[in-house]
Amino acid sequence: MTDSTIPGLLARIQRPTDVAGLSADDLRTLAADLRTAIIDTVSKNGGHLAPSLGVVELTLAMLSTFDPGKDKVVWDVGHQAYAWKLLTGRAADFHTLRRRHGISGFPKPCESEYDHFGVGHSSTSISAALGMALARDLAGDDHHVVAVIGDGSLTAGLAFEGLNQAGDMGRRLIVILNDNEMSISRNVGALSLFLSRNLSKGWARRVKRDVETALKSIPGIGDEMVAYAKRSEHSLKSFFTPGMLFEAFQFNYIGPVDGHDVKALVRNLELAKTNDRPVLLHVLTRKGKGYTPAEANPAFFHGVGRFEPETGRARKPGDTPVLPTYTDVFGETLCRLADMDERIVAITAAMPEGTGTNCFRERHPDRFVDVGICEQHAVTFAAGLAIQGYRPFVAIYSTFLQRSYDQIVHDVCIQKLPVVLCLDRAGLVGEDGPTHHGAFDLSFLRHIPHMSIIAPRDEADLQAAMYTALHLDAPLAIRYPRGVGFGIPLAESPSPLPVGVGEVLKEGEGVAVIAVGSRVHPSLEAAERLAEETGRHATVFDARWVKPLPEAQLLDIVARHDALLFVEENALAGGFSSAVLELLADRNALSGKHIRRIGLPDEFVEQGTQKELRVSLGLCMDGVGKALKELFAAVGNATAS
């Protein structure tokens, strides 16, 4: 949005510190303006709507309490930080949210001095904030460090590792638990208010220490009396609040607090600032707050595409028939397989809707497991199932599988267990940018012994790959992209694919395109268009298998062509083309060949639509066509000379 379209009071916020001087009425008005701006932009650009709507008041309270030019705030994941962006100098550019060359959907230090740590994946905030707190103390500074983490992110082991270390180190640190799964009980809230406002105050802590010292001085029974007193206090607090868990981590606990009451939030944040040890402020919020469709369906509006703000309905792309997504095909195929094979268990890490396993949850609830945001646990859990004769399908976004690397090596591949890793969102995902692109899975999986990798070229190939998985008694990774397929009809009874065998889709001479995964069809289209325009025919080969490679077919193609064009939507470093070139180098088959590769460069690809990013990197029909013309020219020049 431009300055002229920034709603109401929000347009008057020139710097973050302006929030601290606002009246209660102004804060309510500003909260409404923030929600208007967020809904308007996300309805046009897509994004994480419900999480950001739920923390508007919390954001206002934080900016009323802390100085973001001095104090440090780490947002966990960061998809709830839209209000923070609007209030920290980016309101005029907010209309570019998640667009190419626009502002990111996540906090990025290179974007703003008020984004103190880069995020995108879950559960990193406490560890990062603790490191920043230690850095503060080592430097002799006195600012506050705050981590804001959701209850979902708190399920991950990394978050508990951070809590454990923070409690042990005892550094001054504030953790805000944004809990949008609980409702506020008036009775619990009243008692909690008393406990947090009194037992957590400085004078109460001093009295507590003095009493402990006095009790310990009593000969014979002092230590026992101190232990009894602590048990009594903890029992009282934990009976009415969840504070016992965090007290066990040696955090002072405050809460729960109504996350939509700015006055209460400010009061308790000020209280948290007085603590000389780690403190956790438990805040209860409502996901999607202030927008009825999002409040009614927060899961759908967690991450949403373009929609009509008046109704919340998705914007329709005209009269074009909507094709099924790869995720849809995966979910339905997995259900069909499970209908036939009782060994199949579906596992996801807090993403049943995102991975398409929600239909499996409904049809086979006893064989569906959502492990929460615990990708490491998901893989080892699957290994335990596999070693007992089951066939676990682990559905995880490619970018999140990075957390499971050791478990894939140690628990799955060394034991050669038939765990099927289903890598959704492999390749370029679009507007969520570098933290979410599935850029590296081929590179970090293909060198692991016993691992097989298949990259289906379309939705029908994905279906067949899943049937193939049931016939392999070894680990298998199936990678497929975000978005809709190519409209290829699905088979009623798919046949398993032969392992390590690709397919020649077009015969030509001189130049061969060797592609894999979602870039096969654009490569074929480019070759066919080139043939129509110039009469030059390039061979198009779908390798399909990244491991084991279709070695015999590749060597035959290389022997018959002078130039090779590799196309893949993975990092070129260590990816599919690297694997083929290693094979050719080992077989001394590269001499005199013209080589060209199209893939992801050795840099983090920024945000944009999938189409924009593919065009910019040449991973589209036009890009492949341009490379083919250049290779044909190179071959012709070499022949002429």
Curated annotation (Swiss-Prot):
One GO CC term, this protein: cytosol
Nucleotide-binding as UniProt keyword: no
Alphabetically ordered keywords of this record: Isoprene biosynthesis, Magnesium, Metal-binding, Thiamine biosynthesis, Thiamine pyrophosphate, Transferase
Superkingdom in the source lineage: Bacteria
InterPro entries on file: Dxylulose-5-P_synthase (IPR005477), THDP-binding (IPR029061), Transketo_C/PFOR_II (IPR009014), Transketolase-like_Pyr-bd (IPR005475), Transketolase_BS (IPR020826), Transketolase_C (IPR033248), Transketolase_CS (IPR049557)
Residues that coordinate or bind thiamine diphosphate: 79, 120-122, 152-153, 180, 291, 375
Co-factor remark: Binds 1 Mg(2+) ion per subunit. Binds 1 thiamine pyrophosphate per subunit.
UniProt-listed CDD domains: TPP_DXS, TPP_PYR_DXS_TK_like
Pfam families per the UniProt record, alphabetical: DXP_synthase_N, Transket_pyr, Transketolase_C
GO function term, MF aspect, one: thiamine pyrophosphate binding
Annotated EC: 2.2.1.7
Catalytic function, reaction form: D-glyceraldehyde 3-phosphate + pyruvate + H(+) = 1-deoxy-D-xylulose 5-phosphate + CO2
Pathway connected to this protein: Metabolic intermediate biosynthesis; 1-deoxy-D-xylulose 5-phosphate biosynthesis; 1-deoxy-D-xylulose 5-phosphate from D-glyceraldehyde 3-phosphate and pyruvate: step 1/1
Cofactors required: Mg(2+); thiamine diphosphate
GO BP terms: 1-deoxy-D-xylulose 5-phosphate biosynthetic process; isopentenyl diphosphate biosynthetic process, methylerythritol 4-phosphate pathway; terpenoid biosynthetic process; thiamine biosynthetic process
Annotated residues for binding of Mg(2+): 151, 180
Assembly description: Homodimer.
Family designation: Belongs to the transketolase family. DXPS subfamily.
General function of this protein: Catalyzes the acyloin condensation reaction between C atoms 2 and 3 of pyruvate and glyceraldehyde 3-phosphate to yield 1-deoxy-D-xylulose-5-phosphate (DXP).
UniProt protein name: 1-deoxy-D-xylulose-5-phosphate synthase
Organism: Nitratidesulfovibrio vulgaris (strain ATCC 29579 / DSM 644 / CCUG 34227 / NCIMB 8303 / VKM B-1760 / Hildenborough)
Upper taxonomic lineage: Bacteria, Pseudomonadati, Thermodesulfobacteriota, Desulfovibrionia, Desulfovibrionales
Name of the coding gene: dxs
